[in-house]
Design a protein with these regions (language model features):
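Hot-dog-fold acyl-thioester-processing enzymes
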Residues: 1-66, 129-134
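HotDog/MaoC-like acyl-thioester-processing domains
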Residues: 72, 76-81, 85-134
Length: 134
């Protein structure tokens, strides 16, 4: 679960990182989106925070490899906590480096109405367990 963001947090983040009026000017955002919305980048960070704090320390993460896909189907709004779902979709051993592999997972974040506001498929390089020789 990712905590809700306040209007002030959304505006503060947007002023520094994504200063579009739809994230900083509530009156303007209301005309277009029915109210203030969070930057997609802030939504992504909210979705990834539990993953980085809870999952990544438990796996032998070497580093991220980018995103196979990244979407914001709906905006995140002030006061909406996000439900986070993670599904591992593939694990592939490296052909050139036997001590590592690539794990791909789908990360979904949904608002309280269970509508998806963020979905991504990031591949991650991970260490493999040593195989036992017989």
């Amino acid at each position: 679960r990712a905590p809700a963001l306040s209007k002030e947090e959304i505006i503060s983040f947007a002023r520094e990182w994504d200063p579009q009026r739809l994230h900083t000017d509530e009156a303007y955002a209301t005309k277009i989106h029915g109210g203030l919305i969070a930057s997609g980048f802030q939504t992504m960070l909210q979705a990834f925070k539990p993953v980085m704090h809870e999952m990544m320390p438990k796996i032998a993460n070497i580093g991220g490899l980018g995103f196979d896909s990244l979407r914001w189907p709906l905006p995140m709004r002030p006061g909406e906590a996000l439900a986070i779902e993670l599904e591992v979709t593939s694990v592939t051993p490296s052909k050139s480096k036997p001590d590592r592999g690539v794990l791909v997972y789908t990360l979904r974040a949904s608002n309280p109405a269970r509508q998806v506001v963020f979905v991504a498929d990031p591949p991650v390089m991970i260490r493999r367990r040593p195989s036992e020789e017989k």
